[in-house]
Amino acid sequence: MSALAQNETIAHQIKQQGGVEAYLHAQQEKGLLRFLTCGSVDDGKSTLIGRLLHDTRQIYEDQLSTLQNDSKRIGTQGEKLDLALLVDGLAAEREQGITIDVAYRYFSTEKRKFIIADTPGHEQYTRNMATGASTCDLSILLIDARKGVQEQTRRHSFISTLLGIRHLVVAVNKMDLMEYRQEVFNQIKQDYMNFAGQLPTNLDVHFVPISALDGDNIVTISRNMDWYEGPTLLDILETVDVKKEASKQLLRFPVQYVSRPDLDFRGYSGTLSSGILRKGQKVKVMPSGICSQVERIVTFDGDLDFAVPGEAITVVLKDEIDISRGDLLISADDEMMVTRHALVDVVWMSEQPLVQGQNLDIKVAGKKSRGKVENIQYQVDITHLTQRVAVDLPLNAIGSVEFSFEEPLMLDSYQQNSDTGGIILVDRLTNVTVGAGLVREIQTDVYEGPKEFSEFELELNRLIRRHFPHWGARDLLGGK
């Protein structure tokens, strides 16, 4: 493919659409798929992304020229273009020939827009992989045809499903090195399905044999594998149905900001997480439980009659209510649990292990609070998907942890709602993110409000929390 042809792709699409504005409007109307590539070390993840960008004409002339020079200088593919260099951006990655950080790339076809997360294969960078997977709808699991299903393949499959990804594409790469033999592909497919029986049952799994280096079954059907009658990888990406039924879920609107541009306007800004919010709808403010009615739904482009999940809006209520960042708007007839305790699946990202009794700052749906590790139930053995007793969680470990919270929180399970069920764990001294939490189970007892304390008790509590924060004393007033 010539550089000129690649360079003219967008210009040709603009001409077809009838101008720049029409082209931009068409781009906005396209559906978006977020997916990640993951697998074991050197399975060809970066090469696959480079091939997708190359064969869908997303590489410009200057990029191609740089790629040709870099391929000759530090490439690993001989006379061929080393497409992995398109996405391995860090100097350390290029020198070692591996992926360390999560590299994001963007491209589009006539049917869909895509955001790709190229995630690390090395076990010590599993935390980076979990970060990349948290916003994706689909995982491409690369398997080296020479090696078959590896431990990292199982690890990444488990993390993907743990983070709510239900669409998996198992791409058996480097088929060219195995002479494109069908029995190799079939054996790997069988081995993976044997393992996948331990994963959630509602998965949509596709298998495709590919060669990322030569482009077999990436964008065009391979002539070297006539025995494969399925779609290409790009066909799967363009047609997979990843529509989340967020609009059919319960209403969840986390308040991120109170908007007061003047004395006559008071609105509550944020992104609608799930459900449909309509003008005139009765809503309940959590955790106070006060009900009101939606008077306006304000956006940059004007008022709306209703809002759908993913839209950034400002809600104006009929009544003057004390609402602050971290509060939640739900349907008036919804009974949402407010709790101080939850069972959380934790992906630990710090070199210092997570231990029982540890205090952490937490963030959930715009709300900042504090939590304490009451008990570590178990650590997951990713290789065999079994549970083992643990007194701590080391770096890159995944385990089930019982948390208590300083104040009552509004939580859903992560599988129901990733916004109100996802917790960011932050070290209280360094302010560094040390883990990701996914709410598995909410304690059934409902918080009934703060008990009465004397003025002396309240003043002593404030004094201790102000001057001795490392003691981890909770706010007796529940954060109010």
From Swiss-Prot:
What family name appears in the similarity comment? Belongs to the TRAFAC class translation factor GTPase superfamily. Classic translation factor GTPase family. CysN/NodQ subfamily.
Molecular function terms from GO: ATP binding; GTP binding; GTPase activity; guanosine tetraphosphate binding; sulfate adenylyltransferase (ATP) activity
- Catalytic reaction equation(s): sulfate + ATP + H(+) = adenosine 5'-phosphosulfate + diphosphate
Domain tr-type G per the UniProt entry, residue ranges? 30-248
Enzyme Commission number(s) of this protein: 2.7.7.4
InterPro entries documented for this protein? CysN_GTP-bd, CysN_II, CysN_NoDQ_III, EFTu-like_2, G_TR_CS, GTP-eEF1A_C, P-loop_NTPase, Small_GTP-bd
Q: Which NCBIfam families match?
A: CysN, PRK05124.1, small_GTP
Stated name of the protein: Sulfate adenylyltransferase subunit 1
Q: Where does GTP bind?
A: 39-46, 118-122, 173-176
Main function = With CysD forms the ATP sulfurylase (ATPS) that catalyzes the adenylation of sulfate producing adenosine 5'-phosphosulfate (APS) and diphosphate, the first enzymatic step in sulfur assimilation pathway. APS synthesis involves the formation of a high-energy phosphoric-sulfuric acid anhydride bond driven by GTP hydrolysis by CysN coupled to ATP hydrolysis by CysD.
Assembly and partners are described as: Heterodimer composed of CysD, the smaller subunit, and CysN.
Short name of any one Pfam family annotated for the protein: GTP_EFTU_D2
The annotated region (G3) lies at 118-121
Q: Which gene encodes it?
A: cysN
- The organism's taxonomic lineage, starting at the top: Bacteria, Pseudomonadati, Pseudomonadota, Gammaproteobacteria, Enterobacterales
Name the source organism.
Photorhabdus laumondii subsp. laumondii (strain DSM 15139 / CIP 105565 / TT01) (Photorhabdus luminescens subsp. laumondii)
User: Would the keyword Nucleotide-binding be found if you checked this record's keyword annotation?
Assistant: yes
Domain of life according to the entry: Bacteria
Cite the residue spans of the region called G1: 39-46
Keyword annotations of the record:
ATP-binding, GTP-binding, Nucleotide-binding, Nucleotidyltransferase, Transferase
Region annotation G4: where it falls in the sequence: 173-176
Q: Where is this region: G5?
A: 211-213
Q: In which pathway does it act?
A: Sulfur metabolism; hydrogen sulfide biosynthesis; sulfite from sulfate: step 1/3
Give one GO biological process term. Answer: sulfate assimilation
- Transmembrane residues, as ranges? none
Q: Where is this region: G2?
A: 97-101
